[in-house]
Amino acid sequence: MTKSELIERLAGQHAHIQAKVVEDAVKEMLEHMATTLASGERIEIRGFGSFSLHYRAPRIGRNPKTGDRVELEGKYVPHFKPGKELRDRANIYG
């Protein structure tokens, strides 16, 4: 599901709310989540999961085109850990 599909579905389920208001709310929520993660804070949504940053240590990689060795710096990457309810619901289809 894409962001625009999410907005369409939410707007369809809540016909009394204008689609533009739903779009603005979704964009604002995602922006706030990104800002929170960028500041190093953890986000926990009970029943859904948690978002945090994990550190990737520096390593030696390879340029896939040339095969040359490339030094990659350490960096923080977003990480999502699903909650129990989400895992249980996903296993219904698995």
From Swiss-Prot:
One cellular-component annotation, GO: cytosol
GO molecular function: DNA binding; structural constituent of chromatin
Keyword annotations of the record: DNA recombination, DNA-binding, Transcription, Transcription regulation, Translation regulation
Domain of life from the UniProt record: Bacteria
PROSITE patterns xrefs: HISTONE_LIKE (PS00045)
GO biological process: DNA recombination; regulation of DNA-templated transcription; regulation of translation
PANTHER family: DNA-BINDING PROTEIN HU (PTHR33175), INTEGRATION HOST FACTOR SUBUNIT BETA (PTHR33175:SF5)
Family: Belongs to the bacterial histone-like protein family.
Assembly and binders: Heterodimer of an alpha and a beta chain.
Chain's role: This protein is one of the two subunits of integration host factor, a specific DNA-binding protein that functions in genetic recombination as well as in transcriptional and translational control.
HAMAP family from the UniProt entry: IHF_beta
Protein name: Integration host factor subunit beta
Organism of origin: Sodalis glossinidius (strain morsitans)
Gene from which this protein is expressed: ihfB
